[in-house]
């Protein structure tokens, strides 16, 4: 009887975790470059009531008798599928059409992002919305002269600047990196990732479109890959799973109460 109670508790905890993940996905449905997460479950150890036996001369073999002891969270995965892009017409909005990540200098290390909503600070340096520097192919910053007439960013990441005298200048090139296992990247907030032991180190910066990286699309933003239809469906499943496991606990409690009443 206690086994069913603990199985129900483990199930409720797991579905609560699933609801937490779904809630975060839905909250970020409009977050630029956001990648949704999912939860997988695995069964816990099973108690063997009777072991199996091999077939004999006069009788066949038997299977083991086992009772499971509940479930636990297996993995919480980040799904790095490419999502739809939205046209903005803004030069500093960049989408990666394929694999790869922008390199960002956070001041205390290098981070990576798919969110390409970039800006220029008062010095003309290309930065994220939080003021972190966007790095070029060589690991340096990208600067646009404050008196430049205009600038553009090509699909290969090259920045072309028309200076105050109307001459075209080379403004550097945005580099894109890849990972052996992008699923292993750690989310650190602000649409940023950090490499982990399981993601492997970032590749050398490649020109967008080379080395397995996607080309850049200026004037576009990659949107979240969250699908509300899928999330609401999973939310219903998680809600029913939570309710069903809570029913296991209440039913087991009622049976235990009946056993206690037998003494009266």
Swiss-Prot record:
The keyword Acetylation does not apply. InterPro entries: Flag_bb_rod_N (IPR001444), Flagellar_basal_body_rod_CS (IPR019776), Flagellar_FlgE/F/G (IPR020013), Flg_bb/hook_C_dom (IPR010930), FlgE/F/G-like (IPR037925), FlgF (IPR012836), LlgE_F_G-like_D1 (IPR053967). Keywords: Bacterial flagellum. It is found in: Bacterial flagellum basal body. Pfam families: Flg_bb_rod, Flg_bbr_C, LlgE_F_G_D1. Transmembrane segments: none annotated. One of its GO terms (biological process) is bacterial-type flagellum assembly. The keyword Oxidoreductase does not apply. GO terms for cellular component: bacterial-type flagellum; bacterial-type flagellum basal body, rod; bacterial-type flagellum hook; cytosol. Belongs to the flagella basal body rod proteins family. The basal body constitutes a major portion of the flagellar organelle and consists of four rings (L,P,S, and M) mounted on a central rod. The rod consists of about 26 subunits of FlgG in the distal portion, and FlgB, FlgC and FlgF are thought to build up the proximal portion of the rod with about 6 subunits each. This is Flagellar basal-body rod protein FlgG. The lineage of its organism: Bacteria, Bacillati, Bacillota, Bacilli, Bacillales. The gene is flgG.
